[in-house]
């Protein structure tokens, strides 16, 4: 499995990367905002999963998600929103925009494992 990890916080990316690697997944590409993430998505296909923060500079996670879902070449890429946005309307908005799942930060390795289905 190849993962694109998108978060503007280097610390948060480091924490999430460690959690992902703890599940035996080591093919991880990182990006600090939605614009960089879209470039890296195009350059590193096939990507199986995008773990996506909501609040980022340049291009936020929801805008990035909508851009990914508008491009048919990425239709099979799974997206998990990993964000501190826990308000129900925000969760619904992300899922309606094409997220496959949603994790509220901070989350445990077990919660991540459950969302990944492994």
Briefly describe each language-model feature range:
Residues 10-29:
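Two-component/phosphorelay signaling modules centered on CheY-like receiver
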Residues 56:
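Receiver (REC) domain active-site loop signature in two-component systems and cognate sites
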């Amino acid at each position: 499995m190849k993962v694109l990890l998108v978060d503007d916080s280097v610390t948060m990316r480091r924490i999430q990367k460690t959690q992902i690697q703890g599940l035996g997944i080591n093919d991880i590409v990182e990006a600090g905002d939605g614009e960089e993430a879209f470039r890296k998505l195009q350059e590193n296909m096939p990507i199986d999963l995008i773990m996506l923060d909501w609040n980022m500079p340049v291009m936020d996670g929801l805008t990035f998600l909508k851009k990914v879902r508008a491009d048919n070449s990425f239709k099979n890429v799974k997206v998990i929103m990993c964000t501190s946005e826990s308000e129900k309307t925000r969760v619904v908005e992300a899922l309606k925009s094409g997220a496959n799942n949603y994790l509220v930060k901070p989350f445990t390795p077990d919660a991540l494992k459950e969302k990944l289905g492994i």
